[in-house]
Amino acid sequence: MTSISVIKKDITSLTVDAIVNAANSGLRGGGGVDGAIHAGAGPGLMNECAAIIEKNGLCATGSAVTTSAGDLPAKWIIHTVGPIWGEEGEERSSLLLSSCYKSALDAASNLRADSVAFSAISTGVYGFPKKLAAPIAVSAVCSWLEAHQRAEAPSSIFLVCFDEENFRITKAVLDRLGPNNTPWVRTEGQ
């Protein structure tokens, strides 16, 4: 059975099968978590990302692609491009954000990743309101789990929050669900 946990950590320090990067469409590395992941993974990551872009073009918002994790303790990085708040309407942005989580879980399933750690997609420089993003993230993960066989699903999913505000908001969403409403939820402290 899969567990969903919220933790407050630096995603680049986690020893998991896959970490999910909040990437830009060119996979170039940027600010926030994207920049930290690129810096931690080393120069080989930029070469892998450039090869993906050369072959497939820019990554669409809501899609996901996979690379090795380079020098990070994870095995893989799943790069997903979140919506930039204000570029689309709220409904479309919410659907795209949900698609990020589902696409990343599809990629994790294809990798047979047993543990996956998500950054809080689009809540940094892309400006998606944290109070809207957290319920979308949790809902997307839960609906993906409901639609897939246990053999396809990771056994551990971590919603990783770098800042206290995201941690509190996401923990509150998971606490409201609780184990009585979904078999997957387990919240953790810092």
What are these regions (language model features)?
Residues 85-190:
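Phosphate/ribose-phosphate-bearing ligand recognition and processing surfaces
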Residues 1-110:
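Glycine-/small-residue-enriched capping loops at alpha/beta junctions
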